[in-house]
From Swiss-Prot:
Function: Cell surface receptor which may be involved in carbohydrate-mediated communication between cells in the germinal center. Binds glycans with terminal alpha-linked mannose or fucose residues.
Ranges where the record places region Disordered: 1-119
Taxonomic source organism: Homo sapiens
Extracellular topological segments: 194-378
Keywords: Calcium, Disulfide bond, Glycoprotein, Lectin, Mannose-binding, Membrane, Metal-binding, Receptor, Signal-anchor, Transmembrane, Transmembrane helix
Recorded topology in the membrane: Single-pass type II membrane protein
This protein's encoding gene: CLEC17A
Compartment list: Membrane
Cytoplasmic-facing ranges: 1-172
Name of the protein in its database record: C-type lectin domain family 17, member A
Compositional bias segments (type: Acidic residues): 17-27, 43-53, 69-79
Coiled-coil zones: none
Disulfide links within the chain: 254-265, 282-372, 350-364
GO cellular component: cell surface; external side of plasma membrane
């Protein structure tokens, strides 16, 4: 009866409201009018599933929509099914109040396929099924969250992303390089300064060493020079004495204070000196310490001094111990040594003549009188 009234356009008889509410075959009935609220879980799903082929599949970890688990399992042939009517006009003469929305069932069936019914007397609009879209829609689905908007937990909001972190590391690296260069330059500068100080100290030490060597060489050279001067002077005086003796002079005379004997002059000193000082005095006066070559000469000298004084002779063994020689280098041919002399006690290397004309060895550094000998001058 409900269908008859619906076809003829008459209002529903009383009692049909409860029958419609109790109609368990609600999902197989004619789609509701536009002024009725959609069935929970069906209209929005159809609107969202219009672009099902072009939509991006949801994340695997997203929970399923309420009441759609069994629909996804049952709607395997959703792409080949006919979409339901969406723009059906309301029934003529129907003034029934809008139905309250029913609670969503746990198990819902897919919507009816797009199939026209033989309804006479109704002004139904033409229903067109949209062709399936084969193109891929690149626009993100409204239910699918955007990848750009997904927050990443390991990135800090203040860091500004990986680019900002990379810039920060670049800044740290630049600061490290600049610091390393500065420390390297500072170390090089300190090393150069220390090197210059060490080189300056080395030059000063080299200069001091050179000065010390020069002084030592100068002192040694000065001592050698003095020795050479003394030797040259002695040789010169000896040459002059010999030259004067060779000259043919008419009158042979001796200097004042000198005693002549067989063409020679002898000087007996009134003061005392060491052996070296006495030798130097004789050389300065163109003479030498007395050299005895004969008994007559020895007797003249022993008698001439006539006093208990001890005089230096020109005899010594400095070159070799025990080898006594005169100043002219000749060995001793006549010996007038006292008994047990020479004994070389206390480094006694020079010879003296005592009061009786005997010889004795004495240290060259002691002081006593001396006798000089030279040839007579004309």
């Amino acid at each position: 009866m409900h269908n008859l009234y619906s076809i003829t356009g008459y209002p529903d008889p009383p009692g049909t409201m409860e029958e419609e509410e109790e109609d368990d075959d609600y999902e197989n009935s004619t789609p509701p009018y536009k002024d009725l609220p959609p069935k929970p879980g069906t209209m929005e799903e159809e609107e969202e599933d219009d672009d099902y082929e072009n939509s991006t599949p949801p994340y695997k970890d997203l929970p399923p929509k309420p009441g759609t688990m069994e629909e996804e399992e049952e709607d395997d042939d959703y792409e080949n099914s006919t979409p339901p009517y969406k723009d059906l006009p309301p029934k003529p003469g129907s003034s029934a109040p809008p139905r309250p929305p029913r609670a969503a069932k746990e198990t819902e069936k897919p919507p009816l396929p797009c199939k026209p019914r033989n309804m006479t007397g109704l002004d139904l609009a033409a229903v067109t099924c949209p062709p399936p879209q084969l193109a891929v829609n690149l626009e993100p689905s409204p239910l699918q969250p955007s990848l750009a908007a997904t927050p990443v937990p390991w990135l800090n909001q203040r860091s500004g992303g990986p680019g900002c972190c990379q810039k920060r590391w670049m800044v740290y690296l630049c600061l490290l390089v600049v610091t390393s260069l500065f420390l390297g330059c500072l170390g090089l500068t300190v090393t150069l300064i220390k090197y210059q100080e060490l080189m300056e100290e080395l030059r000063m030490l080299s200069f001091q060493q050179m000065t010390w060597r020069t002084n030592m060489t100068g002192m040694a050279g000065l001592a050698g020079l003095k020795h050479d001067i003394a030797r040259v002077r002695a040789d010169t005086n000896q040459s002059l004495v010999e030259l004067w003796g060779l000259l043919d002079c008419r009158r042979i005379t001796c200097p004042e204070g000198w005693l002549p004997f067989e063409g020679k002059c002898y000087y007996f000193s009134p003061s005392t000196k060491s052996w070296d000082e006495a030798r130097m005095f004789c050389q300065e006066n163109y003479s030498h310490l007395v050299i005895i070559n004969s008994f007559a000469e020895h007797n003249f000298v022993a008698k001439a001094h006539g006093s208990p004084r001890v005089y230096w002779l020109g005899l010594n063994d400095r070159a070799q111990e025990g080898d006594w020689r005169w100043l002219d280098g000749s060995p001793v041919t006549l010996s007038f040594w006292e008994p047990e002399e020479p004994n070389n006690i206390h480094d006694e290397d020079c010879a003296t003549m005592n009061k009786g004309g005997t010889w004795n060895d004495l240290s060259c550094y002691k002081t006593t009188y001396w006798i000089c000998e030279r040839k007579c001058s004309c």
